[in-house]
Every structure is written in C-alpha cells, then in structure tokens.
Amino acid sequence: MQGNVIHVDKLYKMMYTDNYETIKKYLEYTVIDKTENYSTSANLIPFIPLHQAIEARNIDIIKSIITVDNVNQPGHDDTYPIHIICKEPNMLAISYMLRSINQCSVFNTLVKIKDMFNYRNVEIAKIILTNRYKNIQDIDLKYIDKKSKDDIIEITKLLFSYGADINMVDRHGNSPLHYATENPDQRLTRLLLSKGANPNILNKTNKSPLYYSIESDNPDITMLLIDKFIFNNTDPILSHAIKHYRKPILHALIENGASINARDKYGNTPLHYAVSYCKDIDVIKLLLERGVDVNAKSYIRNLTPLHSSYLKSPRVLKLLLQYGADINSLDSYSLTPLTSVVLQYLCIECGRIVVSHICCLKRIKPDIENSLGFIDNIDAITSNKRLNQIRLKCEDELNRMASIKITNTYSFDVFVLCDNITLLCKLVNNSIIDDILINSFNIYKGIILKNIYRSRKRLYLIENTLYVLNNTFKPNYMWNRLPVELQNYIMEYIDDASLKVMHEYEKHKLKY
C-alpha cells in the first residue's frame, strides 16, 4: 500500500487471509490500483471487490458491500457475481498466491485435494495461506468440504435476495446453471432450478447445462436436468452421452425425448458413436430396438455405423447385420465396410460372419450381384485365401440345404434365408427337420438352431394361448364359434409379448 492506494492483487489476497475489519478499512479509505502485474496482466483475478470477495467465499465482506446496484455488475471479463459463485474456485490465482509464499509443495497437495472434493477448496486454500495448519494431513477434509459447499449456498441465496439475474449469460454464453452443472454441485443445481434457472439455454458452442452435467458424470444432477429439459429432434445429446459412456442415463434420455437419430456437426448418429466409442453391446442393442437408422451415413466420408465399427467385434457385427446393416454400402472413397479394413487383420469370426452373410444375400436378393458394393466385396473375398475358403464352405452348405426338400415349395435353406416367423412356424414341426444332421452345417448351424428355436417357441405360445382362450370362454361365445383356421390366422398377427400376456392373464383367471 502506498499512501491511500492498494493494488488489486494485494486486495485479492487479503480477501483470503485478512480479517473483516482490516479489509473493510482498506475498502473505505483506499483507492484500488488496477495496473497490470504478474497476475492481472493474465486476467487471472477480478478487479471489483464484490467479485473478489465472492471468489474468496468471504461472506462477511460480501454482506457488507453487496447492493442492488452491484449484484448484476459485470467484471472486466464480463463475468457476473452469480457466475463466480457457481464456478469452480479460481485455482490458478490461488496457485500464484501460494507460490509467492514458497508453498509450491503445499500447492501440489492442494491440487490432489481438489480432485478429491470436486473443486470446492477455497477454505483449504485459506488455511494454507494463513498458516493455520501444522500438517496438511491434520486438516479435517470432510468438514472443510461441507463448509465450502454450505458457504456457496449461503452466498448464492444472498445474491438472489439482492436481485441477481438467474439466467444472466457471460461472454461465453454460459448461464449460472452451466457452471453449477460443470463442477458439479447437486445442492447448488437444485437451488438454481428452484429459482427459475432455464436448463435450455445454449452457450456459444451450442451446449446446454445438460451437456456439462453429462461430462462431469453426476447422474443425480443429470436426472434433475433431464426432467426439466426440452428435447428436440436435432439435438445430438444422446451421442454426447454415449461418447462419454454414461450408460445409466441413456434410458432416461430416450424416454424423455432425446432423438436416437439426431446428427452432430459431422453427421454422426448415436449409433456411430456406440459402435466406435463405448462398444457396449447393451447400448447398441438399445438403440437398434428403439429404431435408430442402422444405415445412416455421416457427412464426412459417408460412413455408416458398420463402417465406423471397423468390423472388430463379432457380437457388434452380428447385431448390426441382424438389424439390416448394409455390408455393401459404399463410402465417399467407394469402400464398403469390408474393403475399408485391412483383411489380413480381420478376425476369423468376423470374416466368417461377413462372408456367410454376403453368400446369403446373393440368394435372397439375386439382383444384388449387380451392385458395385457387392461386386467389390466378392472381389475382396475371392482374392483373399482365408475368406475365399470360407466362401466356398458357405456355398457348399447352402447348396446342401437347398437340396433338402421340406415341402413341395420350401427347402431346408428357408431356416437360414427367411426371416418370416409365421412361415417358419408352419414348417418347423415337419418330421424331415428332425432327421437332418444340423451339426453338418458348421457355418450356418447357429442361425438354423436359432430360427428353429424361436419358431417352436412362438408356436408353443400360440397353441397354449389358444388352449387357454378356448377353455376360458363359454361354448356359445363368439370366439369359440370361429373356425380353428381363423383362430390360428388371428394369432399370427399377435406378437410374442402380447401372446405371453394373454396366456398368463387368462391362465390366472382360470386358476381363480
């Protein structure tokens, strides 16, 4: 201090270290010097005393200088008081103060503590700066953490009582809620929402507070925001959650309106990120079951999710193909998902899945042989010794299945090439099937057994539901007057889940 002048840096440090009376005296009888020095030149600290007091969580000083006129006053960096209290403490400025008193080793410890307690460490900094500790391990971290959070709530309520604008945005377009969810602080978030904070405000990078809560990995805060968030079909929030692998909140996002087909600026959908980032089969299955576009192409290179998967996981590959992923789709470089990977590094199981699928496609859709993608895939397969051997085995198995007649119209290959469950149900109990050595079809054995099992399971459901219905209704009831063929025909249009519900419900009624 020179005469009646105090530099802004010194005043800032006093907010952390000095008592109320000393700071008050300086504020009343001195002029603040705002010339640049080692810290202010880097815009590390605020110039306005109220802003400094809020950063230091100095409640007594805040109470003595806050007014309705300065509660919404922006600082030199266009930051408002309500933003400061919602932000994490100014650890960079604190580090300068610690280094100035040769406390570098203590600062390193403080950084570790900061990571433990989600950046709520102003009280710990005060203890260190005022030398009120003998050993850093002696500090009651839980008590300090609680006090820091309590102070934040008290200061925030004080700002609101003087008219702080809950939805004021700073130069980055961030609202107080953006910062509260980024930290994160559940109590503070609840308080802001209760005071009317708008969770739908987008900052200059087009991110809402919900984006930051997802990044900070606090499901409780995220659920608070989801409940009040207004979703739209173009918001790629689901992709954001998948990129950060926030599996617990995905169901909530979808149920509350997050679009499963929304594209980000690169044209990627949630499925693109699910197969390339988290690679969690449950997440991928969830998206596919909800109707995500399995063949959506990105804006960059026209990549489908199958391209983005790089054919690395047999389970992912099988699931994508099961839901209609196009193995013959071409990207901007005229590469298919198969030709875009280095074939020598393609795992044996993935190679078998791809080749067996392509061989089936040729029989299901004969016209596909004229498509460029199919031609390129066949060329790649035949030019690779390992894949071509698989192709020859596939062709042999399909030819042998085609030679086994189940009826005058259908051959055994129907259990590989057909996905019509109604048709399979009509064929599955044919005695010829029981005589077939399914183990002789090494490549297609899994598909055959799966289709036989699911068709017999459905047939069992239909037959049992019919039995229960026929024994539930009175003889003169309309249902019992229908021909058996018509009853079966009606059952064909009811899905498995509904059949199961009907069966269990009527069985329960019969029991009682």
Swiss-Prot record:
PANTHER family, per database record: ANKYRIN REPEAT AND PROTEIN KINASE DOMAIN-CONTAINING PROTEIN (PTHR24198), ANKYRIN REPEAT-CONTAINING PROTEIN-RELATED (PTHR24198:SF165)
InterPro entries given in the database record: Ankyrin_rpt, Ankyrin_rpt-contain_sf, PRANC_domain
Keyword Repeat assigned: yes
Disulfide bonds: none
One Pfam family cited in the UniProt record for this chain: Ank_2
Name of the protein this chain belongs to: Putative ankyrin repeat protein FPV233
Keyword field: ANK repeat, Repeat
Repeat (ANK) residue spans along the chain: 45-73, 77-106, 136-168, 172-201, 205-236, 238-262, 266-296, 301-329
